[in-house]
Amino acid sequence: MKALLSILTMVFCLSLSGQQYLTRQGTLTFDAGSPLEDIRATSNSATAVYDGKDGKLGVQVLMTSFEFRRALMQEHFNENYVESEVYPKAVFKGEFKDDRAIGTLDIHGVSQDVNVPATLVKENDAVRLKASFAVTIEDFGVAIPRAVANKIDPQAKITVDCTLQAR
């Protein structure tokens, strides 16, 4: 009986470690504000997938899904900065390993290798992914006009908070 219980426990643990997780309602925020201007936006429709078997992790967000406190900011963001008609989404592809998200981040058609602190915590039948890091806006080919350069922080702070459900 003990042997059977041990085998069932091992099989159950192995099935959890090989589980795939998904959300289409992840939260991503960015803050590129300065003392002169509050420039923050949030998207609650990020897609994230995680494979518990091999640690593969992917996150993507439509640029038009970011909501600003003022409609004009949102319009300028999509038309003048990220050019969301040409570059509709930001995508991270990589893996979760040793409390790090390691991979490639593609924004505005430019890919950069990233290695950022992240947590992945099991919560019932889900896992919660959290990360907070900064990116240099110009590293992704997004030009900041001189006329507004003092209003925009060249380092955008990105926060990721996604609860992924088992598939």
Model-derived regions: residue spans:
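Low-complexity, acidic/polar, glycine-enriched regions of mature
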Residues: 18-167
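Bacterial N-terminal signal peptides
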Residues: 6-15
